[in-house]
From Swiss-Prot:
Belongs to the eukaryotic ribosomal protein eL43 family. Putative zinc-binding subfamily. Binds 1 zinc ion per subunit. This is Large ribosomal subunit protein eL43. GO terms for cellular component: ribonucleoprotein complex; ribosome. Gene3D superfamilies: 2.20.25.30. Zn(2+) binds at C39, C42, C57, C60. Keywords: Metal-binding, Ribonucleoprotein, Ribosomal protein, RNA-binding, rRNA-binding, Zinc, Zinc-finger. PANTHER family: 60S RIBOSOMAL PROTEIN L37A, LARGE RIBOSOMAL SUBUNIT PROTEIN EL43. One of its GO terms (molecular function) is large ribosomal subunit rRNA binding. Its cofactor is Zn(2+). Part of the 50S ribosomal subunit.
Length: 85
């Protein structure tokens, strides 16, 4: 039996479906979404995503808005939003 997770990590659960490029891209965002991040308030590495764009620290219960897959916004998004205001 072939190993599905050598190239694509957690996306190996899809087996041979969807192609390796799509599975690699999905895997990159999925790992970002599920990772722990540093809390901006208490500096503990306990921040997890609760919903799309909503992040919560499991240590101090601090909730804040952030990106969809990452609590920090990228510089490109900040420039784009600032340009539209």
């Amino acid at each position: 039996m072939a190993k599905h997770t050598v190239k694509v990590g957690v996306a190996g659960r899809f087996g041979p479906r969807y192609g390796v490029t799509v599975r690699k891209e999905w895997s990159k965002y999925y790992v970002q979404k599920k990772a722990y991040y540093v809390c901006p308030k208490c500096k503990q590495k306990k921040v997890r995503r609760i919903a799309n764009g909503i992040w919560e620290c499991r240590h101090c219960s601090y909730k804040f808005a952030g990106g969809s897959y990452n609590p920090e916004y990228s510089a490109e998004i900040v420039r784009e939003v600032a340009g539209n205001v």
